[in-house]
Amino acid sequence: MFFAIPQALSFSLFGIPMFGVDTCGFNGNTDEELCNRWMQLSAFFPFYRNHNELSAISQEPYIWASVIEASKTAMSIRYSLLPYIYTLFYNAHTTGSTVMRALAWEFPTDPSLASADRQFLLGPSIMVTPVLEQGASSVNGVFPGLAHGEIWYDWYTQSAVTGVSPGQNVTIAAPLGHIPVYVRGGSVLPMQEPGYTTEASRNNPWGVLVALNREGAASGSLYVDDGQSLTPNATLEVELVVADSTLYVSTRGTYVDHNALANVTVLGVGAAPGNVTLNGQPVQSYARYNSSSGVLSLTGLNNLMSGGAWVQDWMLKWG
């Protein structure tokens, strides 16, 4: 498991973005702790499978109760991020960009990251800091870009990481079953409610996660097609941009996705907004603001836009 990250990053450099390892190990017998940690780590790799030789013991996630729960947690995150991951693969196919990335590739001016291979990025927006040592309940990691105003948000609490100095190697709590994941400020992540299969997930409502940077801005993109055809007859591209407390969504393409927009979550909102509108119409009753975490959540939006989340351009404003 320790060598899985540098191996994956090497294949990214080789121009082979669809890479994964034999999760829980291939040769010899695994154990509960190793499989627990590895099932969570591999959930953030481009290719994800559990596989071993016939002579080894069974290592399906359901063999151990703790691995079941750890796998469900990580796979739920992976499945909710499938639209983001699919878009990363589209960009890799069309532009040669990478899916799994070393910290140094995104922050090339920081020489301290040149040999960092215990953390990695999934695309530009998701940072993963896994436990790679037996018996550990914490892990050391850095938060790159802090010297230049970068913000990182904890995936689970949705709060901004604070109290960390630029370049500081921080000890992060990571009990068995928990893998630290962070969202980069300045990102907009289109997501879908996770289903039991990728096909089921593709038919679920949409959500948008906005992580504001220090200037209150963010951006992201989405690529959608039928998910099956080798040469799609119709495609859809969506641009999502945040400026001046407004999320602007613009679409282009001929593919029609009828799944509704269910929720929008904005991280890093400094104060409770006095007014929230969707395409100029008040939606304040759908909004909740958490002053301690700085999170603005809008839920239950399913019936507000007829036809689907991406059938037309739209604008969400708070302030």
Residue ranges and their predicted role:
Residues M127, V139, S245-L247, L296:
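Hydrophobic residues embedded in beta-strands of well-ordered beta-sheets
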Residues A136-S138, V161-V164, Q168-I172, M191, ...:
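A short local loop/turn or secondary-structure capping micro-motif enriched for an aromatic residue
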Residues M1-I179, V183-R184:
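Catalytic-domain carbohydrate-binding cleft regions of carbohydrate-active enzymes
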Residues V181-Q281, N290, G300-G319:
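Accessory, solvent-exposed terminal regions and/or long lumenal/extracellular loops of proteins
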